[in-house]
């Protein structure tokens, strides 16, 4: 489920994170395309937009999330520094979290959320035991992002 912070008007938070909330299925793969335009003009009528494909799948002991490189159409130029925040609802805590085959560092919740709209070179994750939710912070990239949760 794509989300964003609550704002009083379009563009209030220039570098607001893109939030994706996952309720993964153990039996079905899922995917969707996030469509974005500038939110202010009629440029979308001229096919000026950005699309980002997101996929997730489960295997017996891993969950895989792929955020594909955003694809611009019609000269869409807005590729600002922003972060992705993934909120993944899980039955159990993963033992390892990987980003493009590299182990991510565990963070403190306050640090992760404080950096969400100001730091664009930080990656990390935190698991909330109370609501069984894994939060992963990643900078938006011009490459595919492969997230692997191992159990």
Predicted regions and their residues:
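Catalytic core of carbohydrate-active enzymes
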Residues: 1-95, 99-102, 107, 129, ...
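Short beta-strand element of the conserved SAM-dependent methyltransferase core
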Residues: 54, 125, 148-150
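Generic structural detector for well-ordered beta-strands
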Residues: 87, 135-137, 148
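Extracellular/luminal ectodomains and secreted, surface-exposed scaffolds of diverse proteins
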Residues: 102-142
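Low-complexity, intrinsically disordered segments enriched in Ser/Thr together with acidic residues
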Residues: 140-151
């Amino acid at each position: 489920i794509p989300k964003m912070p609550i704002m009083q008007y379009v563009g209030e938070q220039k570098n607001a994170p893109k939030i994706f909330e996952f309720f993964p299925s153990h039996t079905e793969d899922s995917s969707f395309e996030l469509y974005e335009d500038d939110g202010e003009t009629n440029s979308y009528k001229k096919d000026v937009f950005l699309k980002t494909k997101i996929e997730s799948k489960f295997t017996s002991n891993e969950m895989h999330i792929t955020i594909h490189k955003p694809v611009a159409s019609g000269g869409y130029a807005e590729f600002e520094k922003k972060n992705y925040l993934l909120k993944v609802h899980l039955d159990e805590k993963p033992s390892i979290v990987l980003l493009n085959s590299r182990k991510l560092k565990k963070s403190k919740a306050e640090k992760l959320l404080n950096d969400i709209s100001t730091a664009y070179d930080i990656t990390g994750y935190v698991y909330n035991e109370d609501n069984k939710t894994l939060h992963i912070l990643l900078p938006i990239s011009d490459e595919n992002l492969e997230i692997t949760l191992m159990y």
